Amino acid sequence: MEAEGLGWLLVPLHQLVSWVAAGAMVFGGVVPYIPQYRDIRRTQNADGFSTHVCLVLLVANILRILFWFGRHFESPLLWQSIVMILTMLLMLKLCTEVRVANELNIKRRSFAATDSKDEELRVPPRRPYLDFDPHHFWHWSSFSDYVQCVLAFTGVAGYITYLSIDSALFVETLGFLAVLTEAMLGVPQLYRNYCHRSTEGMSLKMVLMWTSGDTFKTAYFLLNGAPLQFSVCGLLQVMVDLVILGQAYAFAHHPQKPAAHAVHPASTKAL
């Protein structure tokens, strides 16, 4: 009798746990970027954050949404992609504003045009939409250029997906590319740390959140029977996170000696 009396609690409790897990999947991925965003705004310095992290996440989540049209997966994963895209656009907007404000003699770099002379001297000439300098790709001076690039990529990828949606091979390949790209999330930051032989400007708190979040996400994929691509993605991300944590430990105990003439920028701990 007592077991039967408690039975009515079990189903609601199970549903509650499912809702909490789904909510954590949707919004948990953006939590690590909150300290990064706040620190960049506080210090007005974005040097410690690689905007290529935003590029990786934008591409990965756009591809994941397109993959959903060919092979439906759980709704929380779809909403997670939408929330992440909006978050990365906010990060790009802040980083662009801060970088431009900190550059005294800035040359305009845009998605639709190559470098021009200083804007104070003359207005840059109109150029074809895709006539951009590859050396300055993803280092533009206007947030609108990033938006144009994202929209162009979404349009092209969406059109190709529309034409090939009936091909199972294409759909599975699309899913693999989405998760493989996302698995490379930490690589731009890892490479930046390696080149500078330092993790200054990178928030250890954020990387720890990355690691815990990716571990939870991978477990969620495995327990809920998500497509194999998602589980592979999660495992690769956890490994990259651990390497970045190793960098933080190594560079903290064996810091690079600064050059005599070097001037360190203000710290921007926030990845």
Curated annotation (Swiss-Prot):
Location relative to the cell: Membrane
Membrane topology: Multi-pass membrane protein
Top-level taxon: Eukaryota
Keywords carried by this UniProt record: Membrane, Phosphoprotein, Repeat, Transmembrane, Transmembrane helix
Transmembrane segments: 7-27, 49-69, 72-92, 145-165, 168-188, 232-252
Stretches assigned to the PQ-loop domain: 14-80, 178-233
InterPro entries per record: PQ-loop_rpt (IPR006603), SLC66/Scramblase_ANY1 (IPR052241)
Protein name: Solute carrier family 66 member 2
Species this protein is from: Mus musculus (Mouse)
